[in-house]
């Protein structure tokens, strides 16, 4: 579920830049419909990937539970049986407290790797957004310093609303 949420956030960040561009009304309506279908497809793909990483589709997990119950491996009396400490798992979902095995360690490594991938993707998306808004902060500061040195701007603060083109009122 964590990975699915991260994928949804990634798609939202990546789609935020095109949504902020001004366009005509008819084009906007057509684009919104196209973007909605694209976002729907992306979310479905993200959910498929998320369920794959989290142990398969719900029907597959239910079939696995039924097989465990039929084989006598699982005492399926309830999903909140905290007292059991044998090797079998009662419930493989989010209420599985305190149990760790090799599979959990592998999943944590996958999450860390996926998290670093999302971190890099987020940095790239922020860089694209900064470039669309006028460059990186350091670049904007350098541009402001150049304008101040050339006498084009009296740089007294970033909220100087009263002046137009460097003239005093």
Swiss-Prot record:
Modified residues (Phenylalanine amide): 82, 97, 161
Record key words, sorted: Amidation, Amphibian defense peptide, Cleavage on pair of basic residues, Repeat, Secreted, Signal, Sulfation
One term of GO molecular function: neuropeptide hormone activity
Residues covered by region (Disordered): 135-169
Single Gene Ontology BP annotation: digestion
Domain of life: Eukaryota
List of residues that carry Sulfotyrosine: 76, 91, 155
Claim: Signal is one of the keywords in the record: yes
First and last residue of the signal peptide: 1-26
A cellular-component GO term for this protein: extracellular space
Presence of the UniProt keyword GTP-binding in the record: no
Expression (tissue specificity): Expressed by the skin glands.
Cell compartments where the protein resides: Secreted
Prosequence residues removed at maturation: 27-72, 86-87, 101-151, 165-169
Pfam families in the cross-refs: Gastrin
Entries under SMART domains matching the protein: GASTRIN (SM00029)
Function: The pharmacological activities of caerulein are quite similar to the physiological activities of gastrin and related peptides.
Family: Belongs to the gastrin/cholecystokinin family.
Protein name: Preprocaerulein type-3
Species this chain originates from: Xenopus laevis
């Amino acid at each position: 579920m964590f990975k699915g949420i991260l994928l949804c956030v990634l798609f939202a960040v990546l789609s935020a830049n095109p949504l902020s561009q001004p366009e005509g009304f008819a084009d906007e309506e057509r684009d919104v419909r196209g973007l909605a279908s694209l976002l729907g497809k992306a979310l479905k793909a993200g959910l498929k990937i998320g369920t794959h990483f989290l142990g398969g589709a719900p029907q597959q997990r239910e079939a696995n539970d039924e097989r465990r119950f039929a084989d006598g491996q699982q005492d399926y009396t309830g999903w909140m049986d905290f007292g059991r400490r044998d090797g079998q798992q009662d419930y493989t979902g989010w209420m599985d407290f305190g149990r760790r095995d090799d599979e959990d360690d592998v999943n944590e490594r996958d999450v860390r790797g996926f998290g670093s991938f999302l971190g890099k993707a987020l940095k790239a998306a922020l860089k694209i957004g900064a470039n669309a808004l006028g460059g990186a902060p350091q670049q904007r500061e350098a541009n402001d310093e150049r304008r101040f040195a050339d006498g084009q701007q009296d740089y007294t603060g970033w909220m100087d609303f009263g002046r137009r083109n460097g003239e005093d009122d």
